[in-house]
């Protein structure tokens, strides 16, 4: 319901969107693709309170109403779909959720650091399109020259056509998950759009964890 998002009003900094603490498709379907009878993350176990591919649905609704308001997505659904990925439910390779959702940024993984840095940047007046420097985030750009010190992954069109190319891409991603040594990664769409994954955010210190 498009009108439902108007209840919030336009935020000062931006919208934060998550599908919840489980991927909405895993939550809705069994491994045999049968619809689950109950939803363990909804009061009363009621099924159907969230849509399939919830992050995409929520963001598309927001973008229809708030054309220029920053949208930042996070949580396990967005994090696991941050780059081109195989979608078991449709048996297809899909683009980064950043593109299909229309969001501006992904706060990837544990976002205690990145979400504060994003808020500080927006609060300072920085455009969301210029927030490209925060560890633990994924952004999109059309400016190849602005992507530095990065490993180029196989293009989306390559992984779409070749399983081996996807395996190489996944291996490179896997080898760059350590926040202390990981490199920046990026993949190309249609030769002109780039999705860039910054290195993971550093882990929290003991005092930071205590504050959380």
Regions found by a protein language model. Give the residues of each.
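Long hydrophobic segments that form regular secondary structure
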Residues: 204-212
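Glycine-rich beta-alpha loop elements in corrinoid/cobalamin-binding modules
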Residues: 2-190, 197
């Amino acid at each position: 319901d498009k009108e439902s998002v108007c209840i919030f009003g336009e935020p000062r900094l931006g919208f934060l969107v998550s599908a919840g603490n489980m991927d909405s498709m895993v939550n809705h379907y069994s491994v045999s693709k049968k619809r689950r009878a109950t939803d363990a993350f909804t009061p009363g176990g009621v099924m159907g309170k969230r849509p399939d591919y919830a992050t995409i649905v929520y963001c598309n609704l927001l973008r229809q109403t708030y054309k220029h308001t920053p949208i930042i997505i996070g949580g396990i659904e967005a994090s696991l779909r941050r780059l081109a990925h195989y979608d078991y439910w449709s048996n297809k390779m899909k683009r980064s959720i950043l593109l299909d959702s229309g969001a501006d940024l992904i706060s990837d993984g544990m976002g205690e650091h990145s979400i504060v840095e994003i808020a500080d940047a927006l609060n300072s007046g920085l455009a969301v399109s210029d927030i490209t420097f925060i560890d633990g985030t994924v952004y999109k750009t059309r400016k190849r020259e602005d992507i530095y010190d990065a490993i180029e992954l196989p293009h989306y069109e390559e992984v779409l056509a070749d399983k081996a190319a996807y395996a190489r891409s996944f291996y490179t991603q896997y080898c760059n998950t350590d926040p202390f040594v990981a490199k920046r990664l990026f993949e190309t769409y249609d030769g002109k759009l780039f999705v860039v994954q910054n290195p993971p955010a550093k882990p929290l210190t003991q005092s930071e964890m205590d504050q959380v």
